[in-house]
């Protein structure tokens, strides 16, 4: 038997939680989140509004307040999506029509919402959280489990976010988050990975 897991779940289970699992039995690759045709259709969205999409999941409310106050100071419009309080179609609609996003979440194993945003080719600033509290355990983690420099900017503190924001916004044209999705996260890529594992079992 083999188990398919994300890289961070593999690290947590095998090396940090002490589970008696043979690492050779675990295959690490992500689930697909979109088909290639739909992904390519997202490239047509060019005339985006000067607006920031904020995604907020299980973080201190003070973190959100700091970010919204910063955007207000810079006269940047924003739309907030709170985890569990939105329809997915509305998140996608906003992502396809916003210039950039700020993503704040607890650590994720794969992070489907983040990847759906990236599939809309919206550059993100991710305020990362690297510690995952699970029951009585303290595990390593990250807010963004799959990432590349094409996707945007990863920061560890609000101070860093504040310092980097202007330069990030001025250089949005340099980012192509959709490249990461094409390479790793389409349904077609997932099918190819599964087929390979079955053929080399």
Give the role of each language-model region.
Residues 1-25, 62-63:
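A short, active-site helix/loop in glycosyltransferases that binds the activated sugar's phosphate group
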Residues 167, 183-201:
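C-terminal alpha-helical cap of glycosyltransferases
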Residues 9, 26-39, 132:
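Short beta-strand->alpha-helix junction loop in the catalytic core
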Residues 106:
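Aromatic "clamp/platform" in nucleotide-sugar-dependent glycosyltransferases that forms part
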Residues 93-98:
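Short alpha-helical donor nucleotide-sugar binding micro-motif in glycosyltransferases
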Residues 31-91:
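Conserved catalytic-core segment of nucleotide-activated headgroup transferases in glycan assembly
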Residues 110-184:
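Catalytic binding pocket for nucleotide-activated donors in carbohydrate/polymer assembly enzymes
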Residues 101-102:
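A short hydrophobic beta-strand element within the catalytic core of glycosyltransferases
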């Amino acid at each position: 038997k083999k188990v398919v897991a994300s890289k961070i779940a593999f690290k947590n289970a095998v090396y940090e939680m002490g589970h008696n699992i043979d690492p050779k039995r675990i295959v690490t690759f992500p689930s697909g989140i979109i088909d290639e045709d739909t992904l390519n259709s997202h490239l047509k969205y060019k005339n985006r509004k000067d607006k920031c999409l904020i995604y907020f999941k299980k973080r201190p409310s003070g973190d959100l307040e700091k970010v919204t106050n910063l955007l207000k100071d810079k006269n940047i419009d924003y739309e907030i999506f709170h985890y569990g309080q939105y329809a997915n179609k509305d998140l996608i609609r906003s992502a396809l029509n916003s210039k950039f996003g700020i993503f704040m979440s607890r650590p994720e194993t794969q992070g489907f919402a983040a990847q759906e945003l990236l599939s809309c080719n919206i550059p993100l600033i991710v305020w990362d959280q690297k510690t995952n509290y699970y029951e009585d355990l303290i595990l390593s983690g990250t807010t963004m489990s799959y990432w590349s420099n094409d996707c945007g900017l990863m920061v560890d503190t609000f101070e860093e976010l504040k310092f980097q924001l202007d330069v990030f916004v001025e250089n949005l044209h340099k980012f192509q988050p959709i490249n990461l999705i094409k390479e790793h996260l389409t349904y077609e890529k997932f099918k190819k990975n599964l087929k390979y594992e079955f053929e080399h079992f």
